[in-house]
Amino acid sequence: MKPLFTGTGTALITPFKNGEIDWDALDNLVESQIAGGVSALIAAGTTGEPSTMTWDEHIEVIRFVAERAKDRACVIAGTGSNCTREVIHAANVVKDFGVAAQLVVTPYYNKSTQEGLVAHYTEIAEKTSLPIVVYNVPSRTVSYTHLRAHET
């Protein structure tokens, strides 16, 4: 099986200035990463602090990064949420921006069972067309998707 991604990827921060997204700083960040040889950019992953943004801002960050990186680096869009329907909605919106995949963090705070996590990711896979990068970060989410769960 051929890998979806090769090379180096950077999880981007989302710069803010006076409580608003600093689009010029984000543009400079994207350009500097691409100039440095990065082949993938992760937009609105946990490093980008999407939990501190509105969904409109979250989606706009992904759109902005995808537009700036077009044909120069692939973009992996952070679509994760506790709400499966929100993940599906976000993925179906950002696919039109030309992103390569979606980064989906395990649902946090609610502490799902493995069966619940499998149901979450299965529904996302069934209702979206973007490849899913399962993002396990148990120190933040208090849950972990075991590899065996993905065999189902």
Task: Report each predicted region and the residues it spans.
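Active-site beta->alpha loop and helix N-cap motifs at the rims of alpha/beta catalytic domains
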Residues: 3, 17, 23-142
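Conserved small/polar residues in nucleotide/adenosyl-binding loops
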Residues: 145-152
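Hydrophobic pocket-lining residues within nucleotide cofactor-binding pockets
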Residues: 15-16, 149
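N-terminal amphipathic/basic leader segments beginning at the initiator methionine
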Residues: 2-13
